[in-house]
Amino acid sequence: MNWNFLRYKIHQNWNGIEKHGEENIMELEELKKIGNSIGFFKVEELNIDKIKLLPEVRQMCSTDKCHMYGRNWSCPPACGTLEECAADISVYKKGIIVQTKGELEDEFDGEGMMETEALHKEHFIKMHDRLKKEFPKLLSLGAGCCTRCAKCSYPDAPCRFPEKRFSSMEAYGMLVTQVCQDSGIEYYYGPGTITYTSCFFLE
C-alpha cells in the first residue's frame, strides 16, 4: 500500500475525521451540528499545518494582566514551555476552531463582554465533554484560563482534575487572530460585537 498516497487523500478530502478499528467516523458536518446545537456561532476546520507558537505571545502572558500567570495549572509557566506545547500539538492532524459572538451596547460595555465570555466558556466545556467521548486524546484550548475549580490548587497541590483541565490558545503561544485567518474565519465581526475563540485538537 502506498502510505504517502493514502495520507495525501485523507488530507485532501476533509469529509470527516476517520478513526480506525473499533472507533467511529465523525464528519466535519456532524461536528458543526454538535457545536451549533451547543451554542457556538461558528464551527470550522482548524488549519493545524499553519499553527505557530510564538514567544512574543507567551511573553504577553508574563505581563500578568489577567492576574493568572504563575497562579493556575493551565497557565504559564505551569502549562509547559513552548517546546513542550509544540510537542503536545505535533501529534494531531485534525481539529476544529469554534467561536461565540456577542452583541455589545457600545465599546465600553464591560458587562456584555463578561456575559459573552461566560457563555463561551459554558459552550466550550460542553463541547469538550461531548468530544472527549469520541476522542479520548482530545486537546482543548480555550479563551482564558481554566475555570473548572473556583480556586486553582497551583502551586500548593496537584491539579484536582488533570483530565478536565484546559489551557488557553494564548498560553500555548498562539496568536488567535492569525489562527482565525489561517483557518478561513473572521476574528472581528464589526462594531457592536465581541467574539471569543477556542479550538479542539481531535486526532
Where are these regions (language model features)?
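Short, Lys/Arg-enriched N-terminal segments with co-localized hydrophobic residues
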Residues: 9-25
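Catalytic cores of enzyme domains
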Residues: 28, 41-72, 76-203
